[in-house]
Amino acid sequence: MNPTVAAASVIAAALAVGLAAIGPGVGQGTASGEAVSGIARQPEAEGRIRGTLLLSLAFMESLTIYGLVIALVLLFANPFA
């Protein structure tokens, strides 16, 4: 394998994981903070808020997992080799 392609694949994998984690990380922090705030204002709605929060956190986390899958493909099943 060309060393330039190998180095570019490693850098691209690092960027894929890093950039894929920034957005969902900020979103999860914001969503969790707002959920805690909502539960503090309306304790009787805790069940609905928590259910919605967990579902939305799962969707946000899937974006990070997609970035990880792309990084693993670039590292181990390199399509550019």
From Swiss-Prot:
<keyword id="KW-0406">Ion transport</keyword>
<keyword id="KW-0812">Transmembrane</keyword>
<dbReference type="InterPro" id="IPR002379">
    <property type="entry name" value="ATPase_proteolipid_c-like_dom"/>
</dbReference>
<keyword id="KW-0472">Membrane</keyword>
<dbReference type="InterPro" id="IPR005953">
    <property type="entry name" value="ATP_synth_csu_bac/chlpt"/>
</dbReference>
<keyword id="KW-0066">ATP synthesis</keyword>
<dbReference type="GO" id="GO:0008289">
    <property type="term" value="F:lipid binding"/>
</dbReference>
<dbReference type="GO" id="GO:0045259">
    <property type="term" value="C:proton-transporting ATP synthase complex"/>
</dbReference>
<dbReference type="Pfam" id="PF00137">
    <property type="entry name" value="ATP-synt_C"/>
</dbReference>
<dbReference type="GO" id="GO:0046933">
    <property type="term" value="F:proton-transporting ATP synthase activity, rotational mechanism"/>
</dbReference>
<protein>
    <recommendedName>
        <fullName>ATP synthase subunit c</fullName>
    </recommendedName>
</protein>
<comment type="function">
    <text>F(1)F(0) ATP synthase produces ATP from ADP in the presence of a proton or sodium gradient. F-type ATPases consist of two structural domains, F(1) containing the extramembraneous catalytic core and F(0) containing the membrane proton channel, linked together by a central stalk and a peripheral stalk. During catalysis, ATP synthesis in the catalytic domain of F(1) is coupled via a rotary mechanism of the central stalk subunits to proton translocation.</text>
</comment>
<keyword id="KW-0138">CF(0)</keyword>
<dbReference type="InterPro" id="IPR038662">
    <property type="entry name" value="ATP_synth_F0_csu_sf"/>
</dbReference>
<comment type="function">
    <text>Key component of the F(0) channel; it plays a direct role in translocation across the membrane. A homomeric c-ring of between 10-14 subunits forms the central stalk rotor element with the F(1) delta and epsilon subunits.</text>
</comment>
<dbReference type="GO" id="GO:0033177">
    <property type="term" value="C:proton-transporting two-sector ATPase complex, proton-transporting domain"/>
</dbReference>
<feature type="site" description="Reversibly protonated during proton transport">
    <location>
        <position position="61"/>
    </location>
</feature>
<dbReference type="InterPro" id="IPR000454">
    <property type="entry name" value="ATP_synth_F0_csu"/>
</dbReference>
<dbReference type="GO" id="GO:0031676">
    <property type="term" value="C:plasma membrane-derived thylakoid membrane"/>
</dbReference>
<keyword id="KW-0793">Thylakoid</keyword>
<comment type="similarity">
    <text>Belongs to the ATPase C chain family.</text>
</comment>
<dbReference type="InterPro" id="IPR020537">
    <property type="entry name" value="ATP_synth_F0_csu_DDCD_BS"/>
</dbReference>
<feature type="transmembrane region" description="Helical">
    <location>
        <begin position="5"/>
        <end position="25"/>
    </location>
</feature>
<keyword id="KW-0446">Lipid-binding</keyword>
<keyword id="KW-0813">Transport</keyword>
<keyword id="KW-0375">Hydrogen ion transport</keyword>
<feature type="transmembrane region" description="Helical">
    <location>
        <begin position="57"/>
        <end position="77"/>
    </location>
</feature>
<comment type="subunit">
    <text>F-type ATPases have 2 components, F(1) - the catalytic core - and F(0) - the membrane proton channel. F(1) has five subunits: alpha(3), beta(3), gamma(1), delta(1), epsilon(1). F(0) has four main subunits: a(1), b(1), b'(1) and c(10-14). The alpha and beta chains form an alternating ring which encloses part of the gamma chain. F(1) is attached to F(0) by a central stalk formed by the gamma and epsilon chains, while a peripheral stalk is formed by the delta, b and b' chains.</text>
</comment>
<keyword id="KW-1133">Transmembrane helix</keyword>
<dbReference type="InterPro" id="IPR035921">
    <property type="entry name" value="F/V-ATP_Csub_sf"/>
</dbReference>
